[in-house]
Design a protein with these regions (language model features):
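Surface-exposed patches in mature extracellular/periplasmic domains of secreted proteins
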Residues: 54-61, 136-140
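Sequence contexts marking disulfide-bonded cysteines in secreted/extracellular proteins
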Residues: 10, 40-51, 100-102
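Secreted/processed peptides and extracellular or luminal domains of membrane proteins
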Residues: 15, 52-53, 107
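Bacterial Sec signal peptide processing site at the extreme N-terminus
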Residues: 3, 7-37
C-alpha cells in the first residue's frame, strides 16, 4: 500500500465490486496527477488486480482498511488484536502482490516526488513488518498507515505549490 498512496493516481473506472475501489483523495484536496494517462491506467489496473485476490479480501475485512467506504474500518482502526497466523500469511501475500505495483507508481516522477513516494514505502513497510511480527495491533497499524498517508499527501501538496 503503500497501496492506497499508489491508488491515489487511479483513473475513474467504474468498479465491478467494492474491492476494486481505490482510495482517491477528494477533488478539493487532490494534488495534480502524478502520472500520465497511460501510466495511471496501468497503475490502476495493477492495483485492481491486487485487490481481487482472496488474500486481499481477507486483509481488507480483517487487517487493513484498504478500500474506500470499508464497512470494517471502524473496527479495524480500534482493534486491540494482533495478527493471527492466517491473517499474517494473507497480509504477506497481499503485500507481495501490491508491492509489484510500486515500479509503475515511480515511473515518470520528478526526483522530489519520487523521494516522497520512496519515503512512504519505507515507512509503511516498517508498519507492516511490525504488524506481521506482532509488535503492534491491527488498530495501531491502521492508524499509523492513515497518518503516513496524510503526511505523504501533505508533502505532495507542498511540492505542487513550489
Amino acid at each position: 500500500m503503500g497501496i492506497v498512496l499508489l491508488s491515489g493516481c487511479a483513473t475513474n473506472i467504474t468498479p465491478n465490486n467494492p474491492v476494486q475501489v481505490a482510495k482517491v483523495p477528494s477533488p478539493m484536496t487532490a494534488p495534480a496527477p502524478d502520472h500520465s494517462g497511460s501510466v495511471a491506467k496501468r497503475l490502476n489496473d495493477c492495483i485492481i488486480r491486487g485487490n481481487q485476490s482472496a488474500d486481499a479480501l481477507l486483509v481488507d475485512s480483517q487487517v487493513i482498511a484498504v478500500t474506500r467506504n470499508n464497512s470494517h474500518a471502524k473496527a479495524l482502526f480500534s482493534s486491540a488484536d494482533k495478527l493471527k497466523d492466517e491473517q499474517a500469511k494473507a497480509l504477506t501475500n497481499y503485500l507481495a502482490e501490491a508491492n509489484s505495483c510500486r515500479p509503475i507508481a515511480l515511473e515518470g516522477l520528478s526526483p522530489e516526488k519520487k523521494a516522497v513516494y520512496e519515503d512512504f514505502f519505507k515507512k509503511i513497510d516498517g508498519v507492516y513488518a511490525d504488524l506481521i511480527a506482532r509488535k503492534i495491533t491491527i488498530g495501531v497499524a491502521n492508524q499509523e498507515r492513515q497518518l503516513l498517508m496524510q503526511d505523504t499527501h501533505m508533502k505532495k501538496l507542498a511540492l505542487q505549490s513550489k
